[in-house]
Amino acid sequence: MKTYNIYEYLPKRFFTVNPQYTATRRLVYAFKDGKKWATKYVADVVVNLLTKWYGEKASDFVLVCAPCASQKKYNYRFLKFAADVTRRAHIQNGSAYVNIFGRRESKHNNALHVVSESFGYMVNLDADFFKGKKVIIFDDLITSGATAEEFKEQLDNVGATVLGGLFLAKTVHNDGIRGAYKEIKYKQYSA
């Protein structure tokens, strides 16, 4: 699946002197928490991108936000965002046709620890709505891409054609002191 990320997200466990990484962290956390300023900012950026890429043809496509841990979190994080983006970009809104049952714990993956537990977690898609539609998936973060690929497969199974994924940020990794040295060397930060 083709993917496009707006920003690069460096997890807190990595040191950085780059103010852009710090600002992106704040934006991602605020968006995930449903903060109005972050939701509005991200909606503005996404509307501008979709309008630039598709213009008047945007109405031929469906924007659907990827499922998150629970229906409550999905509604809180994405429903107003999706309604605003789709109204302003003149693209169809598929987020109201995603239902999440149960809950999935957050995925925390690193070399030493993997957590991904589900408790009756199931995502249900309205096949009548998605059948034959050209879909763009939106999510806040992409790390490995596994969650987006799983969701793409579910959409494919109900007859949708997924054109790609649009992400607020892609997780990148820094390598400690050498990473800070590279940031200074390439003038991402000046002392």
Language model: regions and residue ranges:
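Active-site-facing substrate-recognition patch
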Residues: 1-58, 99-131, 171
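Short glycine-rich phosphate-binding loop at a beta-alpha junction
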Residues: 58-69
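Glycine-rich phosphate-binding loops at beta-strand->alpha-helix junctions
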Residues: 67-77
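Charged helix-capping and loop-helix junction motifs
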Residues: 77-83
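Hydrophobic alpha-helical packing residues
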Residues: 85-89, 155-156
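PRPP/pyrophosphate-binding module of the type I phosphoribosyltransferase fold
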Residues: 100, 105-191
